[in-house]
UniProtKB/Swiss-Prot annotation:
Residues 201-388 form the GMPS ATP-PPase domain. It holds the Pfam family GATase. One of its GO terms (cellular component) is cytosol. ATP binds at S228, G229, G230, V231, D232, S233, T234. The active site is at C80 (nucleophile), H174, E176. The gene is guaA. It comes from Chlorobium phaeovibrioides (strain DSM 265 / 1930). It is an enzyme of class 6 (ligase). InterPro entries: Class_I_gatase-like, GATASE, GMP_synth_C, GMP_synth_GATase, GMP_synthase, GMPS_ATP_PPase_dom, NAD/GMP_synthase, Rossmann-like_a/b/a_fold. This is GMP synthase [glutamine-hydrolyzing]. Homodimer. Its EC number is 6.3.5.2. The lineage of its organism: Bacteria, Pseudomonadati, Chlorobiota, Chlorobiia, Chlorobiales.
Length: 513
């Protein structure tokens, strides 16, 4: 399989570069900016892309690529900081710009006969997305300018003349961002026409490769998978099942913190998928251990430890554990930015493999979320399952703020069911990335039936996003919100006030806890 390496210098858009490449049918991987030529050779890519980054190539904190990558004979495209790293390496000059460029900008491509560029073939003068405070002020020897903007005379450069064979290109703007109107076409020109890559990455080719790999790794051993009914674990389980059939044993843990009637619904929709699933009813155990606990971090840790205990009871002869790890999780562990500050503990079965001496099978670790759904469709999984909104591992324990008890969980389940039901009936469910209700640890005064009430406050949350890394609050119609609020207050005993969360991520997170 032909591939492209993206070297990460810390740009917020690095994952977007990799995704745009895959949309062209080409497999891409993200590695740290410091990756050595030897490691690059092991990956055997057909091209390299240098991402943007937040530092300056001339500063004390400059992060620069290994100089040996420019001698590998591979086509290289530098984006924003990547362009500046190229100019710096080949003897050009990069300086702070007196006039920064952030947002949309118009670029002009040099179309004179002696400047005709393969990179800009079929690319009209158009708006692109800029995000830089530095710019190239002196062209390195053996390079030429192919495009300019109002603030950057050297908005695009490429090797030519004696260096033409190097096939090194640089762009000051971000072709991977949707605001760069013809950016994807430009990436296609680089990868297909200049690097000569033949697209061979697809959901089907991925599935075929994974099935072969899973069979080889698992052999005749049995495999266990914790399945939640979410997109990732369901697709992972079905993919492994396609490879090894009845050797796979799935366990669904009902912790009493799921959506209303979730356990029954999940077991029902898993039936047609041909999976062998055991339902572990552990509602009382989880809720007992959470009694009186208000700290969200403590709740997460209790749920994580309890999940491991329950899961252990179902491990017998299994040698492998299936996990639904996705590519963003893998990227985070090797990113230029290093380990991120822990905002919340992640609830997963990460403690199981080492503790139980289980080997991992992570069939989705090369995929982004949208690719997981595409693989699910190829596997024949129903759209209702694939398009379910994300649900936190600790479940409603982090949506019932404060201490958790069965009564408060039931109130939240009933309210959330109304919210989701109305979103679906109004055709709004698929228009938002995620929607849910939060039961707040406060009460408010109200009047119902001429009587004073003092009951719970509920918050509704709906966000729009592509990957959950950033999100904007969904601008749901006011009449829709009024209908949902009215139904909840009238139909759910214990709630007399409904609020709508209009916070974006950042600065807020999507979940409240």
């Amino acid at each position: 399989m032909q591939s492209v390496l993206v070297l990460d210098f810390g740009s917020q858009y690095t994952q977007l570069i990799a995704r745009r490449i895959r949309e062209l049918g080409i497999y891409s991987e993200i590695l740290p900016y410091s990756t050595t030529p030897e490691t690059i050779r092991e990956h055997n890519p057909r091209a390299i892309i240098l991402s943007g980054g937040p530092t300056s190539v001339y500063g004390d904190s400059a992060i620069l690529p290994h100089p040996g990558i420019f001698s590998l004979g591979l086509p290289i495209l530098g984006i924003c900081y990547g362009l500046q790293a190229i100019a710096n390496h080949f003897g050009g000059a990069v300086e702070s710009s007196s006039k920064q460029e952030f947002g949309r900008a118009k670029i002009l491509v040099d179309r004179s006969a002696d400047h005709e560029s393969l990179l800009f073939e079929g690319f009209p003068d158009s708006d692109v997305w800029m995000s830089h405070g530095d710019k190239v002020t002196r062209m390195p020897e053996g390079f030429r300018v192919t495009a300019s903007s109002g603030n950057s005379e050297m908005c695009a450069i490429e090797s030519y003349g004696s260096k033409a064979a190097l096939k090194i290109y640089g762009l000051q703007f971000h072709p991977e961002v949707q605001h760069s109107l013809y950016g994807k076409q430009l990436l296609g020109n680089f990868l297909l026409n200049i690097a000569g890559i033949t697209p061979d990455w697809s959901s089907k080719s991925f599935i075929d490769h994974q099935i072969e790999d899973i069979r080889e790794r698992a052999g005749n051993n049995t495999v266990i998978c914790g399945i939640s009914g979410g997109v990732d674990s369901t697709v992972a389980a079905v993919l492994v099942s396609k490879a090894i059939g009845k050797q796979l044993h799935c366990v669904f843990v009902d912790n009493g913190l799921l959506r209303k009637n979730e356990a029954e619904k999940v077991m029902q929709f898993l039936k047609p998928l041909g999976l062998k699933v055991t339902l572990a009813d552990s509602r009382d155990l989880f809720l007992t251990r959470l009694k009186g606990v208000a700290s969200p971090e403590k709740k997460r840790k209790i749920i994580g430890r309890t999940f491991i205990r329950v899961f252990e009871e179902h491990i017998h002869e299994e040698k492998f554990l299936v996990q639904g790890t996705l590519y963003p999780d893998v990227i985070e562990s090797v990113s230029v930015k290093g380990p991120s500050e822990t905002i919340k503990s992640h609830h997963n079965v990460g403690g199981l493999p080492k503790r139980m001496k289980l080997k991992l099978i992570e069939p989705l670790r090369e995929l982004f979320k949208d690719e997981v759904r595409a693989v699910g469709r190829e596997l024949g999984i129903a759209e209702d399952i694939l398009m379910r909104h994300p649900f936190p591992g600790p479940g409603l324990a982090v949506r019932v703020l404060g201490s958790v008890n069965p009564e408060r969980v039931e109130i939240l389940q009933n309210a959330d069911e109304i919210f989701i039901e109305e979103l679906k009936s109004s055709g709004l469910y698929q228009q938002v990335w995620q929607a849910f209700s939060v039961l707040l640890p406060v009460q408010s005064v109200g009047v119902m039936g001429d009587k004073r009430t003092y009951e719970n406050v509920l918050a509704l949350r709906a966000v729009e996003s592509t990957d959950g890394m950033t999100a904007d609050w969904a601008h749901l119609p006011h009449d829709f919100l009024a209908k949902v609020s009215n139904r909840i207050i009238n139909e759910v005993r214990g709630i007399n006030r409904v609020a709508y969360d209009i916070s974006s991520k950042p600065p807020a997170t999507i979940e409240w806890e």
